[in-house]
A protein has these predicted regions:
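Catalytic P-loop NTPase motifs of RecA-like helicase/translocase cores
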Residues: 42-43, 183-184, 322-324
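Conserved FAD-binding catalytic core of PHBH/FMO-like flavoproteins
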Residues: 67-70, 95-97, 118-292, 305
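Conserved mid-domain beta->alpha element of the FAD-binding
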Residues: 11-28, 36, 175-176, 206, ...
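Active-site-adjacent segment of FAD-dependent monooxygenases/related oxidoreductases
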Residues: 45-136, 383
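Conserved Rossmann-like nucleotide-cofactor binding loop
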Residues: 17, 41, 181
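C-terminal helical "tail/cap" subdomain of flavin- and related membrane-associated enzymes
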Residues: 3-10, 71, 78-80, 88-102, ...
Length: 426
């Protein structure tokens, strides 16, 4: 066990949020850190992750070498004139009735381009990002094969972590970065709390990759090589270039009130996928036909927690505010969390300060991150013609400024306020 008279921190979970936090603490503080990861090595599932301008700025603030390495491997729109565009939004299917079609609800109709501010947006392969993070961390920082079972908060004597393999570890505090199925969250909130476990959002998706040359042949260069969003009744599709422009990534979403399965991901057949999009326009149908075998990914989020901490236990990233992907900002919020918490912890001089530091972090992040969960669910309804209906003028108006509050955030102002409050509370 680690001696209790030394200030040291455990991070549970070696995903994007956990490793960004570990790098922050390595760069900003002298606090020893141990990362406990359930898997035999660092790694991430899922094809890609989106970072908006706010997240790109946070990555640069955490580590310029990380930003340079990730930036070299990031994917963006391939047309130079589209570098400032987040997504081009289009109608993906014909209107449900003659009135809708007369108003322009026709497959292929261009709605608008949503532009983003500098430093732009990145699409990054999750495993590439984790690889780059791991390279910048001391190799002896991680403990693998550690599945957390319990945390005992002993107050001034620290916390004791118990793992499935029977081992224990004592630290000054623990930060749970263990994702949407977070064991740390259930310990903090209690297993019976409705907010302790993931909630199905009424949406699911198929994911796949299409060779870029085939996509260009069917869609043309502009639509294949740049980020596109196709909207429709109870569904939408996103496409964007990955693998240095050699492939087009596809995420195809559908609405469904029920998810009767125990698992979040289940196998799907090509026939199921084609049936789900049978009444869509030619572009979307052609894309689905090009996709290979795909699983079905149910989309869950977390109901609001009253706080992201309890005593010497803190939550970060998806463990505190997992959201749907409809605004492309969930992973970015985890990076923001890591930067904010790292900056607050640089002012901690003794273990007794940690609960107050966690409280300051929770207050700084709660409103913004919960707003993401709520507005991301709303965005799913908007894209699926379930919020403004198929009124494309209202949808365009909603899109115009929808992302500004996410992208234009000055985190340093929140950090300054949090540190001031933390100092007063000590």
């Amino acid at each position: 066990m680690v001696p209790t008279d030394d200030l040291n921190i455990a991070i549970v979970g070696g995903g994007i949020g956990g490793l960004c936090l570990a790098l922050c603490l390595e760069n900003f503080t002298s606090i020893p850190v141990t990362v406990y990861e359930n898997a035999p090595q660092f790694g991430e599932i899922g094809a890609g992750v989106a970072f908006g301008p706010n997240a790109v700025r946070a990555i640069k603030q955490i580590s310029e070498p990380l930003a340079a390495a990730v930036g070299r491997r990031a994917n963006m729109n391939m047309f130079p004139e589209k570098k400032g565009v987040w997504f081009d939004f289009r109608v993906g299917m014909d209107g449900a009735n003659e009135s809708a079609r007369a108003r322009g609800v026709l497959a292929g109709t261009f709605l608008c381009s949503v532009e983003h501010p500098e430093p732009g947006s990145w699409m990054v392969n999750r495993s590439h990002l984790v690889d780059e993070l791991a390279k910048l961390l001391p190799p002896d920082m991680a403990r693998f094969g550690k599945n957390l079972i319990d945390i005992e908060d002993l107050g001034s004597e620290g916390v004791v972590l118990t793992f499935e393999d029977g081992t224990t570890a004592r630290h000054s505090a623990v930060i749970g970065c263990d994702g949407i199925k977070s064991r740390t969250r259930r310990i903090v909130l209690g297993d019976e709390n409705p907010a302790a476990n993931p909630a199905y959002t009424g949406k699911y998706c198929y994911r796949g990759l299409v060779p870029m040359d085939k996509a260009v042949e069917l869609l043309g260069e502009e639509k294949a090589m740049n980020c596109q969003a196709y909207l429709g009744y109870h569904g939408h599709m996103l496409t964007f270039p990955v693998a240095g422009g050699r492939m087009m990534n596809v995420v195809a979403f559908q609405s469904s009130n029920d998810w009767p399965h125990d698992k979040m991901v289940i196998p799907a057949t090509k026939e199921q996928m084609l049936s789900s999009f049978s009444d869509w326009g030619p572009d979307v149908l052609n894309i689905v036909r090009l996709m290979g075998q795909s699983d079905i990914w149910a989309l869950f989020d977390l109901l609001p927690a009253e706080a992201y901490h309890k005593g010497r236990v803190c939550l970060l990233g998806d463990a505190s505010h997992a959201s749907t992907p409809f605004q492309g900002a969930g992973a970015g919020m985890a990076v923001e969390d890591a930067y904010v918490l790292g900056c607050i912890l640089r002012h901690v001089k003794q273990a007794a300060d940690l609960p107050s530091a966690f409280e300051a972090f929770s207050k700084a992040r709660l409103e913004r991150t919960q707003k993401l969960v709520t507005t991301s669910r709303e965005a799913g309804h908007l894209w699926h013609f379930e919020m403004e209906g198929d009124d494309i003028e209202k949808i365009k108006e909603n899109l115009k400024d929808r992302m500004n509050w996410i992208w234009n955030k000055n985190l340093d102002e929140d950090i300054e306020e949090a540190v001031a409050g933390f100092g007063e509370g000590k």
